[in-house]
Amino acid sequence: MLSTMRPRLSLLLLRLLLLTKAAHTVGVPPRLCDVRRVLLEERAHCLQQLSKEKKGALGPETASGCEGLWDNMSCWPSSAPARTVEVQCPKFLLMLSNKNGSLFRNCTQDGWSETFPRPDLACGVNINNSFNERRHAYLLKLKVMYTVGYSSSLAMLLVALSILCSFRRLHCTRNYIHMHLFVSFILRALSNFIKDAVLFSSDDVTYCDAHKVGCKLVMIFFQYCIMANYAWLLVEGLYLHTLLAISFFSERKYLQAFVLLGWGSPAIFVALWAITRHFLENTGCWDINANASVWWVIRGPVILSILINFIFFINILRILMRKLRTQETRGSETNHYKRLAKSTLLLIPLFGIHYIVFAFSPEDAMEVQLFFELALGSFQGLVVAVLYCFLNGEVQLEVQKKWRQWHLQEFPLRPVAFNNSFSNATNGPTHSTKASTEQSRSIPRASII
């Protein structure tokens, strides 16, 4: 029985590890090393009790019966023959199921019998459940998806950020905000990789104890990166809304305020969360959020920022529709607003509106929530990089110009041929740099994305 239970327990702990990696919501299972720590503590306590039994004077019936036993799960005291011994479910199984039950062994002339009923069933942990098998496979696929998503997003964001930083003609307020947004997505991807490496690189119990301070610092950094990313998405929505709603708007004047909102406000809330967590829920590595009131210190501002962005989205659509219907609007400006509407419609749904949908979702919708938050959310940076940089007409024409200059320097006698269709096809959210510069003098709100 013990030989068959050990691989089952290993499989159970593996699933527990995957569950912990996938979710950061209230009520998720404990970490694998926490379970193993409890198991080793129970073992040490049991061996101490059995040692006391051996040193003490055992009765004649007990001496001729079954000797005390630690079976790698439960502690069985010494017993007289022909008796049934009852013990409670192991604590590490209670951590997984919260179901209290009893286990039994018979003391026979040949020694201890097998444990009955099966510990996993008696304690509410059904290892052979087909639902657990499906969930295990689902979480493995989910891990692959969000790893690929964050990796591809990180690569594309680094390229996009280097492009915007390299060309001085692209340096303007809107692109400065875009670059800050790119950095926030880069930090979000890196923080996920660092968190996984720190939390799950080792399952040894001593690792959990020795790296508690560093582990908590990693979680503080992780939470800050998540909040900063949502804050810069809010800044993007606020910037678009302000440009459309206010007639005279000094972009450079408010850039410092945007930077303070994007990087400063998350630091305040994360600091409050860390202080609250230290005094009210200073357990583990701060990766399990069992206290809902503490978790709302971070969760509340994130949901509020998404709600505000959604309001901006509705109002931006209202303003755009009103401007497009105005007969006095010139044709060139109408084209600009159409491109703006297209870019806005592509951008605003990426602000995390799905987070509100699943913020109060029931437990049976957890897998769908994890899919949207981890799998699809990990590709968010990739989509934003494509929308803000690679599909931007100004960026494309600057890259084309740089390529022409390099080609003329390397091959001065070979003409450079560019199809006119390239400029027409790639003229994304904005016109060329020269055209947009000239038009921006008369239409300051034309090129926003």
From Swiss-Prot:
Residues 168-174, 240-254, 316-340, 392-449 are cytoplasmic. CDD domains: 7tmB1_secretin (cd15275). The chain crosses the membrane at residues 142-167, 175-195, 217-239, 255-276, 292-315, 341-356, 368-391. GO terms for molecular function: G protein-coupled peptide receptor activity; peptide binding; peptide hormone binding; secretin receptor activity. Residues 425-442 have a biased composition (Polar residues). Phosphorylated on Ser and Thr residues at the cytoplasmic C-terminus by G protein-coupled receptor kinases (GRKs). The keyword Signal applies. Residues 425-449 are annotated as: Disordered. GO terms for cellular component: basolateral plasma membrane; cytoplasmic microtubule; plasma membrane. Disulfide bonds join C46-C75, C66-C107, C89-C123, C215-C285. This is Secretin receptor. It comes from Rattus norvegicus. The gene is Sctr.
